[in-house]
């Protein structure tokens, strides 16, 4: 059976049998969730999962090594967490993650002028990830790709369901996804960004929750796919809530991040949460129902 009964007709246990793919992942030095891919039978290539990227990306030498050709005269505007730019497109005959195949995918080709490409060869963005419900297990160190229509039609025992909101990126058709954090009775939209190795916050959010940040203890740099940014302050949030879940001691870095402007959040309290926010909790992103499933603590 794909599911195990859990005592209620409408509540089922999400187990490995329903996953289309279970693949090991590693955590990069910047907190990225990295899996191995094959491009046109070339690889393995190290790609990071990134729900903050609307389009998948290949870096630097990967197109040349994989025999990819840039599409003449075609460019795409890529919005990163820190910067934006226009970059050429390439078409991949087949991109494989484990046994899951994506054919004729269009990827942006970015130069390797950031520190990020020294650790990864590319990014799997929402254009690939939204074809599935995506599960990440910190304890098992695996990524699970589930059939999206099956997961969206179920509720699961032992998982909390958190609503996600779709935020339009610029004037295009791409979207980012956010959840609401509650800190000191203030609701703060937080972009769910698997490509963010750290939790981030703008100054307006720090002021709204009336917690005094301290100057950055180090000259830490946040490395983005397009540009980099230096952390100017950091904030330890001792208590916060996400729906009916409560969390303690989450570190947020503060700087100027372009993505807040792109999402029309530059004049509002806003944050970004990456995989580090969940620590040892497993989670599943259900794009169809716009919800985040978080495994209950033990």
Model regions: which residues?
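Pepsin/retropepsin-fold aspartyl endopeptidases
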Residues: 1-298
